[in-house]
């Protein structure tokens, strides 16, 4: 008896055949990197498969199978949805429904992501009249198989019903709403290649609008129509090709539909384009810069095209409103319009004048398409001679010195690439991503955000946001000096080396070329050099130490420099990420500013005089709260000078009021209150000291989702710990007043236990930290006086990190005197002041450092 091999089921065979054909096309794409042939070939293969299924299901010739959407265009990415319409005649037999369902099911079985609709012609027209999404998908309908007559009747009815003006308005509104979901910027850390501003959807929207208006359905046709130039058409094709290729590569790498350029895939995507890491830039950063440049160009050209199409569909009834610059610029319907197409060629100095007029002229809300196009096509005019022209340098300084509109003008200069062509080093950082785990903007966007933040300090409507900064900038002469410093503080990022030092040289050259002299030039250069210093001192050093304040005051040297650095620092931190700034950091910086200002004003930073002042202020507050006159003495006699220097009068008064009756308490006293500083909880712990106390408190905070911002640890003369913590709960919208009692009860109960310290939890890293891990660093050294040891820790942030550090210190009986927890987005840079007892032993130092590195490792 001979064995026979069973034939595979037809459906299985067809699926395997289709899968093999698709795999061959993808392999060809990987080697040849031509995306258009791939998309067309995938569409043809899908057409063939659907025709075969249609015939197998015995669907009659009176029906039509229609491709719509991207499939209708004949453009399928490797894992795109396949959108189809089964077009029915007005009258059809009910048994057809079963066959249509079978056809759609078999298409799914084939491995296609089918999006299907089954409608008559009348139903299609009715749906399209109510839903612009349906109307859009039908715009590119293409017959695959079935009745040609039915399909042509449908297309005729569709075109008759299509209102080009209404369609334009609906699609532009839809685009604006879509852009708003992405904060109106293409510069997202993880952009959606299809949907983000400047992505493929913007290009498709323009072609849909043009097709609906009868202007053409390709860049070549729009060029022929005069809506774009040859150069613009080439630029659009080039960037469209890049975006399509990037999307296809994302699909191939992920093995599924993947339109978001997530961190996990950025490196692989970059390598697929041939990018290699350098000493200054990761491969992923190079790819992202290419993407941002493409998205920026698409955004700019889309603005021009949409305005041009709008002008054709809605001819203006009024002409020039007023002449703004004779022979150069006019205002037309609220837009700045060039007087002639060759204005910038004949008058290159008019390029910057356009932005000055936009900034200074009330009622002008933007640049017209004609002006934008002329700027776009004047790139060759913006050369070295143009940059050196004294008229342009004067105009640039005028733009910086206007009383309002500066932020908008600089954003527009960047969007049109004029800023990068005037400041060549700025051009180098346009689209430069910063994978440092706390900047969420590209370098150019960060710089403009810092400029915007400084400007907001000076705007009365925003004075409530940062009242102290607004108060300072009102009396700051020539605030444009700060704007120049903002432009240059990070301009040397990505070059390798110290960006502050490199930026100083750029700033010095700019000042020399633009007539900024004397103290103003010196201030600009000094600010660029030291733009990180104030935040480092405030967040990493013991600012209760008079020596620290005196040293910082000597560096600053004057009140004007101090104010300038403070304003730039606040604006800089706020411009990194919405997550990085908090009111606690604001307090640290303001305290440092005020302490330094006092020294610059002649005050001597003397510990004993400061001690006396703090105590007098605290006693005055205690009297207001009706605490008996000498009640404080029992507690204060047990406290050293360091305690009074590290706490302000309000905290001293609060802690004294809580503790003066319980100086020798047998049980832990825990009190919590909403922090007077802002969105945080202040927690006071008073209990007999023990070596694992700090770690135990951190364990409680960790288990309850509370992040420590600051810890001030004190040991009284009679052996009690008097510790003060500032904590936040960032994961949830919490009212700290509501959880204060719970924290008091739970933490007091936890401290009453004698249980050993729990094992630290290895909290999950964020995707950003997993993709861009930083090398953990631990530095342990004696302070300048030899009284304490300073422990500096740098690592990826994760839940449980602080407790992991505290547990290692507790295991080696190393006491924590103070802690500054500095969270910068996805990374931490923490500083601890440790009791020096025992750490003078080099072997113990090495052991502690080794175990800390192991504890904080990813």
UniProtKB/Swiss-Prot annotation:
Keyword Cell division assigned? no
Per its record, the protein catalyses:
[protein-PII]-L-tyrosine + UTP = [protein-PII]-uridylyl-L-tyrosine + diphosphate; [protein-PII]-uridylyl-L-tyrosine + H2O = [protein-PII]-L-tyrosine + UMP + H(+)
Kindly give the InterPro entries that the UniProt entry links to this protein.
Answer: ACT-like_dom_sf (IPR045865), ACT_dom (IPR002912), HD/PDEase_dom (IPR003607), HD_domain (IPR006674), NT_sf (IPR043519), PII_UdlTrfase/GS_AdlTrfase (IPR013546), Polymerase_NTP_transf_dom (IPR002934), UTase/UR (IPR010043)
The protein's GO terms of the molecular function aspect are: [protein-PII] uridylyltransferase activity; phosphoric diester hydrolase activity
Q: What is this protein called?
A: Bifunctional uridylyltransferase/uridylyl-removing enzyme
- What keywords sit in the KW lines? Hydrolase, Magnesium, Multifunctional enzyme, Nucleotidyltransferase, Repeat, Transferase
Pfam families, from UniProt?
Answer: GlnD_UR_UTase, HD, NTP_transf_2
Q: Which domain of life is it from?
A: Bacteria
The encoding gene is glnD
Briefly state the protein's biological role: Modifies, by uridylylation and deuridylylation, the PII regulatory proteins (GlnB and homologs), in response to the nitrogen status of the cell that GlnD senses through the glutamine level. Under low glutamine levels, catalyzes the conversion of the PII proteins and UTP to PII-UMP and PPi, while under higher glutamine levels, GlnD hydrolyzes PII-UMP to PII and UMP (deuridylylation). Thus, controls uridylylation state and activity of the PII proteins, and plays an important role in the regulation of nitrogen assimilation and metabolism.
- Annotated ACT domain ranges read 682-761, 790-858
Q: Which CDD domains match?
A: ACT_ACR-UUR-like_2, ACT_UUR-like_1, HDc, NT_GlnE_GlnD_like
Write down the required cofactor(s).
Mg(2+)
**Domain comment quoted from the record:** Has four distinct domains: an N-terminal nucleotidyltransferase (NT) domain responsible for UTase activity, a central HD domain that encodes UR activity, and two C-terminal ACT domains that seem to have a role in glutamine sensing.
Q: What is its EC number?
A: 2.7.7.59, 3.1.4.-
Family designation: Belongs to the GlnD family.
> Does the record's keyword annotation contain Cytoplasm?
no
The ranges of region (Uridylyltransferase) come to 1-324
User: Where does the record place the HD domain?
Assistant: 443-565
Q: Where is this region: Uridylyl-removing?
A: 325-681
Summarizing activity control, the record says: Uridylyltransferase (UTase) activity is inhibited by glutamine, while glutamine activates uridylyl-removing (UR) activity.
GO BP annotations of the record are: regulation of nitrogen utilization
Gene3D superfamilies (alphabetical): 3.30.70.260, Beta Polymerase, domain 2, Hypothetical protein af1432, Nucleotidyltransferases domain 2
């Amino acid at each position: 008896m001979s064995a026979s091999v069973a034939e595979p089921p037809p459906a299985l065979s067809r699926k395997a055949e289709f899968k093999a054909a698709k795999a061959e096309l993808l392999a060809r794409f990987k080697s040849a990197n031509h995306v258009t042939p791939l998309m067309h070939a995938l569409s043809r293969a899908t057409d063939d498969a659907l025709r075969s299924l249609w015939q197998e299901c015995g669907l009659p010739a009176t029906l039509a199978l229609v491709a719509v959407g991207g499939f209708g265009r004949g453009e399928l990415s490797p894992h795109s949805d396949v959108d189809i319409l089964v077009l029915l005649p007005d009258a059809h037999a009910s048994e057809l429904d079963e066959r249509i369902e079978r056809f759609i099911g078999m298409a799914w079985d084939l491995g296609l992501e089918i999006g299907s609709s089954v409608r008559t012609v009348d139903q299609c027209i009715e749906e399209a009249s109510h839903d612009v999404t349906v109307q859009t998908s039908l715009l590119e309908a293409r017959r695959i198989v079935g009745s040609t007559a039915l399909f042509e009747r449908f297309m005729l009815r569709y075109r008759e019903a299509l209102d080009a003006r209404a369609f334009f308005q609906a699609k532009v509104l839809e685009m604006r709403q879509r852009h708003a979901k992405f904060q109106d910027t293409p510069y997202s850390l993880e952009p959606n290649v299809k949907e983000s501003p400047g992505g493929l959807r913007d290009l498709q929207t323009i072609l849909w609008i043009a097709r609906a208006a009868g202007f053409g359905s390709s860049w070549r046709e729009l060029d022929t129509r005069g809506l774009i130039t040859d150069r613009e058409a080439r630029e659009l094709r080039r960037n469209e090709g890049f975006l399509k290729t990037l999307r296809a590569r994302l699909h191939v790498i992920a093995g599924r539909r993947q339109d978001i350029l997530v961190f996990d895939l950025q490196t692989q995507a970059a390598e697929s384009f041939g990018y290699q890491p350098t000493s200054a830039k990761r491969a992923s950063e190079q790819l992202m810069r290419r993407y941002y440049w493409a998205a920026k160009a698409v955004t700019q050209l889309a603005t021009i095209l949409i305005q041009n199409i709008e002008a054709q569909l809605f001819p203006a009834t009024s002409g020039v409103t007023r002449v703004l610059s004779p022979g150069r610029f006019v205002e037309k319907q609220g837009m700045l319009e060039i007087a002639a197409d060759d204005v910038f060629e004949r008058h290159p100095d008019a390029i910057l004048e356009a932005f000055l007029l936009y900034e200074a002229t009330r009622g002008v809300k933007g640049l017209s398409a004609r002006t934008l196009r002329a700027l776009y096509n004047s790139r060759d005019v913006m050369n070295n001679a143009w940059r050196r022209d004294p008229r342009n340098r004067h105009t640039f300084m005028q733009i910086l010195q206007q009383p309002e509109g500066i932020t908008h003008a600089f954003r527009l200069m960047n969007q049109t690439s004029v800023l990068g062509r005037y400041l060549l080093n700025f051009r180098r950082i346009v689209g430069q991503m910063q994978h440092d785990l706390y900047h969420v903007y590209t370098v150019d966007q960060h710089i403009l955000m810092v400029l915007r933040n400084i400007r907001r300090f000076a705007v009365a409507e925003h004075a409530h946001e940062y009242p102290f900064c607004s108060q300072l900038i009102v009396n700051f002469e020539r605030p444009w000096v700060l704007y120049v410093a903002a432009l240059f503080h990070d301009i040397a990022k990505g070059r390798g080396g110290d960006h502050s030092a490199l930026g100083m040289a750029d700033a010095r050259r700019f000042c020399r070329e633009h007539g900024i002299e004397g103290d103003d030039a010196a201030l600009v250069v000094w600010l660029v050099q030291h733009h990180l210093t104030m935040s480092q001192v405030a967040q990493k050093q013991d600012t209760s130490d008079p020596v620290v304040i005196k040293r910082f005051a000597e560096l600053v040297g004057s009140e004007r420099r101090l104010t300038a650095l403070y304003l730039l620092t606040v604006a800089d931190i706020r411009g990194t990420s919405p997550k990085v700034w908090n009111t606690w950091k604001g307090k640290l910086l303001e305290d440092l500013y005020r302490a330094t200002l006092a020294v610059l004003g002649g005050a001597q930073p003397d510990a004993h005089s400061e001690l006396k002042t703090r105590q007098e202020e605290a006693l005055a507050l205690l009297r207001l709260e009706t605490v008996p006159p000498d009640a404080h003495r029992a507690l204060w006699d047990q406290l050293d000078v360091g305690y009074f220097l590290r706490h302000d009068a309000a905290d001293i008064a609060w802690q004294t009021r809580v503790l003066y009756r319980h100086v020798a308490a047998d049980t832990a006293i825990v009190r919590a209150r909403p922090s007077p500083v802002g969105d945080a909880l202040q927690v006071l712990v008073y209990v007999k000291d023990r070596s694992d106390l700090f770690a135990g408190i951190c364990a409680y905070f960790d288990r309850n989702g509370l992040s420590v911002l600051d810890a001030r640890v004190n040991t009284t003369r009679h052996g009690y710990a008097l510790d003060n913590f500032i904590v936040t709960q960032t994961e949830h919208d919490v009212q700290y007043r509501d959880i204060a009692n719970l924290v008091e009860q739970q933490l007091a109960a936890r401290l009453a236990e004698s249980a050993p310290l729990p094992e630290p939890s290895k909290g999950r890293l964020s995707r950003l930290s997993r993709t861009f891990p930083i090398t953990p660093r631990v530095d342990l050294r004696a302070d300048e006086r030899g009284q304490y040891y300073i422990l500096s820790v740098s690592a990826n942030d994760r839940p449980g990190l602080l407790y992991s550090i505290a547990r290692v210190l507790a295991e080696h009986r190393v006491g924590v005197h103070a802690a500054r927890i500095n969270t910068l987005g996805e990374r931490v840079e923490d500083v601890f002041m440790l009791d020096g007892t025992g750490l003078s032993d080099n072997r113990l130092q090495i052991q502690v450092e080794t175990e800390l590195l192991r504890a904080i490792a990813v």
